UniProtKB/Swiss-Prot annotation:
Organism: Arabidopsis thaliana
Disulfide cysteine pairs (residue numbers): none
Protein name: GCN5-related N-acetyltransferase 5, chloroplastic
One Pfam family from the record: FR47
PANTHER family: ACYL-COA N-ACYLTRANSFERASES (NAT) SUPERFAMILY PROTEIN, GCN5-RELATED N-ACETYLTRANSFERASE 5, CHLOROPLASTIC
GO MF terms held by the record: N-acetyltransferase activity
UniProt subunit comment: Oligomer.
Name of the gene this protein is made from: GNAT5
UniProt record, GO biological process: N-terminal protein amino acid acetylation; peptidyl-lysine acetylation
Protein location: Plastid, Chloroplast
Tissues in which the UniProt entry reports expression: Expressed in green tissues.
Length: 319
C-alpha cells in the first residue's frame, strides 16, 4: 500500500471510523495528444481575464484590440480572472508550456499542469489513494471527493504560485502485436507550492518555510505503481521549481513508518531537517519527517535516472 502525501486545508481525522528530461513542444503531437503545445508570445501584459470580463469601453478600435490582446495567449485553464503582474503572467506562460517526458521500460509518460477539465479525474485519483492510506470505508469516498474537489478549486485560485501537475502513461505495445497503440491514461498527480503566496494556510507539521517550494499530495494510480512513474513526478516537480522559483531549497514530508519512500527520498538527495515529536500521536497523526533538498542549477540536458518502484516515491503528511 502506497502512502499518500496529502496536505488539504481541512482535517480528515473526522472521516475516520471509530477505532529527467524536459520536453518542450512547439507543435501538436499526434503521439501524445494530451500534451498542449507552447506558443511564444511577447507582450507587456497586465491581466488575464476571460473575454466576458474585459471592459467593453471601446470608443476606439485601438482600445478594443489592446484589451483582447492581453489575455488571448492563455488557454482557458490558465485565465485566473484577476489582475496579474507581468511576472505572474510570465510564470503562467511557463506553466502553460511546461512538459516533462520520459520513456520507461513498460511504456512512456509525460507530466504537465492539470487542466480544468481534468479536475474530476484528479479528485478521483487522490480520493482513492487517500482513502486507501487512511483505511476509510467506501461510504466515506463521496464526502472525501467533495472535500478534495473544493480544495483543488481553491488551490487553482493561487496560480501561478502553486500548481497541480498530472502525469499520463501509455503502455508500450509489443512490436509483434496486431493491437493498435494503447490509450494514454492519467497515472498520477503531485502538487507543487512554488513560493509564499502559494503556500498552504494550514501546512502539516513539522512546518516547512512558506517562502520555499514544497512538494505534496503525490500519488500514483494503484495498478500503475512500480513502473517509475512516481519518481518522474518528483523529477518533473523539481524541474518546474528550477524554472520558476528563485529558491532552490525544496521541502516535502515523509511519514516515519514509510521506510521505502524515506529511502527513495534519501537517494534523490533529500535530508531530514526536523521530525515530529511524539505529541502528534495525541492528535491521531503519524509522526513525520520534514525533508529538504537543494536543487542544482537547471541544465539544458539533464540526466534522468530510472527507478523501478513507485511505492518508494510517495510521501505522507497529516495522516
Amino acid at each position: 500500500m502506497a502512502a499518500l502525501s496529502i496536505s488539504l486545508a481541512f482535517s480528515v481525522d473526522s472521516l475516520k471510523p471509530t477505532q529527467s528530461t524536459k520536453f518542450g513542444f512547439s507543435s501538436s503531437s499526434h503521439r501524445y495528444p494530451l500534451l498542449y503545445s507552447c506558443k511564444s508570445h511577447r507582450s507587456n501584459l497586465r491581466f488575464a481575464f476571460p473575454p466576458s470580463s474585459v471592459s467593453t469601453a471601446t470608443e476606439t478600435g485601438e482600445e478594443n484590440s489592446k484589451s483582447t490582446g492581453n489575455y488571448a495567449f492563455l488557454e482557458e485553464s490558465f485565465r485566473t480572472g484577476r489582475f496579474l503582474s507581468n511576472d505572474e503572467l510570465e510564470k503562467l506562460k511557463t506553466l502553460e508550456g511546461f512538459a516533462y517526458f520520459q520513456e520507461l521500460e513498460s511504456g512512456s509518460m509525460w507530466v504537465r499542469v492539470m487542466r480544468h477539465e481534468e479536475m474530476d479525474s484528479t479528485v478521483h485519483l487522490l480520493a482513492e489513494s487517500f482513502g486507501e492510506s487512511m483505511l476509510l470505508p467506501s461510504g466515506y469516498q463521496s464526502v472525501l471527493r467533495f472535500l478534495i474537489k473544493q480544495y483543488l478549486i481553491e488551490r487553482r485560485e493561487v496560480l501561478p504560485h502553486a500548481v497541480t501537475l498530472v502525469g499520463f502513461f501509455r503502455k508500450k505495445v509489443d512490436e509483434f502485436s496486431d493491437d493498435g497503440e494503447e490509450e494514454a491514461v492519467m497515472a498520477g498527480t503531485v502538487e507543487v507550492c512554488l513560493e509564499k503566496r502559494g503556500a498552504n494556510a494550514s501546512p502539516p507539521s513539522p512546518t516547512p518555510p512558506k517562502e520555499s517550494p514544497y512538494i505534496c499530495n503525490m500519488t500514483v494510480k494503484e495498478d500503475l505503481r512500480r513502473r517509475g512513474i512516481g519518481w518522474h513526478l518528483l523529477k518533473a516537480s523539481e524541474e518546474l521549481i528550477s524554472q520558476i522559483s528563485p529558491s532552490k531549497d525544496v521541502y516535502l514530508h515523509c511519514r516515519m513508518v514509510d521506510e521505502a519512500p524515506f529511502n527513495m527520498y534519501k537517494k534523490a538527495g533529500y535530508e531530514v531537517v526536523k521530525t515530529d515529536t511524539v505529541l502528534v500521536l495525541l492528535m491521531l497523526q503519524r509522526r513525520k519527517h520534514l525533508m529538504r533538498k537543494k536543487l542544482l542549477p537547471l541544465c539544458t540536458n539533464p540526466i534522468v535516472e530510472m527507478v523501478g518502484s513507485d511505492n518508494e516515491l510517495t510521501s505522507s503528511a497529516n495522516v
